[in-house]
Design a protein with these regions (language model features):
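NAD(P)H-binding glycine-rich loop region in Rossmannoid oxidoreductase-like domains
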Residues: 1-29, 39-42
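Conserved Rossmann-fold NAD(P)-dependent oxidoreductase catalytic core, especially the SDR/UDP-sugar
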Residues: 7, 34-79, 99, 107
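Active-site beta-alpha turn of Rossmann-fold NAD(P)-dependent dehydrogenases/reductases
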Residues: 9-10, 49-53, 110-112, 149, ...
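Short beta->alpha connector loops of Rossmann-like oxidoreductase domains
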Residues: 12-14, 57-58, 116
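NAD(P)-dependent short-chain dehydrogenase/reductase
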Residues: 61-64, 68, 91-170, 183-185, ...
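C-terminal substrate-binding subdomain of Rossmann-fold SDR/epimerase-dehydratase oxidoreductases
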Residues: 138-256
Length: 256
């Protein structure tokens, strides 16, 4: 049997779909997560790694949220159904690790906004960074950005995320929870300006549309546990990461 199961699959979409159909991701993900945990347990898997989400946290404003704060309050309304789906799946992970006579070690990973190669670039299902990257590569002009551009996110490049993930798998045992993030907040406007700069899209006429759906104004995550317990620090800067992601998508324009 398998020593490790990395449960990275999820039914996801962007802000527009979530605004139209708030419950669309609840049932598919709850069913999938429940069956995968059950199958892993029956197969005597040594460690089950569940990729949760930083969006499940309660709002903490401009203060980075820490791991132990997950259940300190309700998640934000815009994420409410999806966030509680993630929280329920985390509780299932904790149950398998701590409430059974024969436990299965589980690890809950809460990433910030991951970006890079093999992301979802379809506008209906992509998150904001991938959508911006696609518009940059396709040279949209005028360049429409949903929202005001002032929303703040924590971005982590996919290779940094994987490095942090593998370190957590190696060093965390029994049951644990870990934020994997950069610990640095950037605005959507800064992400866009960096992407335009690294790809030399100098004549872009950017139009911010505050009437279009967006999610939360600020989402920051604390990476102290990641640094102190695992000795991990992301290596890829925003400009390097966006440059590499843009080049990847340019070579794979149908990867939507």
């Amino acid at each position: 049997g398998a020593d490790f199961v990395f449960h990275c699959a999820a039914n996801t979409s962007g802000a527009a779909v979530m605004a139209r159909t708030p419950l669309v991701h609840v049932t598919p993900n709850v069913v999938m997560n429940t069956y995968l945990l059950e199958a892993a347990y029956e197969a005597s898997v040594k460690k089950f790694i569940f990729i949760s989400s930083g969006a499940a946290y309660p709002p903490t404003g401009d203060r980075p949220v820490e791991e132990e704060e997950m259940f300190n309050g309700d998640p934000e309304d815009v994420y409410f159904p999806v966030a509680w789906m993630k929280r329920y799946s985390e509780i299932l992970c904790r149950t398998y690790a701590t409430k059974l006579s024969v436990p299965m070690s589980t690890l809950v990973i809460r990433p910030s906004n991951i970006y890079g190669a093999y992301d979802k670039f379809d506008f209906d299902t992509s998150h904001v960074t991938a959508a911006l990257i696609r518009r940059v590569v396709e040279r949209h002009n005028p360049f429409e950005v949903w929202g005001t551009g002032e929303d703040i996110r924590d971005l982590i490049f996919i290779e940094d995320f994987i490095d942090g993930l593998m370190l957590a798998v190696k060093k965390c045992n029994f049951y644990d929870e870990m934020n994997i993030c950069s610990g640095v907040g950037v605005t959507i406007k800064q992400i866009l300006q960096t992407a335009l700069l690294v790809d030399h899209f100098d004549n872009a006429h950017v139009q911010f549309n505050p009437d279009k759906p967006s999610t939360t104004p600020v989402r920051l995550m604390d990476n102290s546990r990641l640094k102190e317990r695992l000795g991990f620090q992301p290596k890829i800067s925003l400009s390097e990461g966006l440059g590499r992601a843009i080049q990847w998508y340019r070579k794979h324009p149908f990867a939507n």
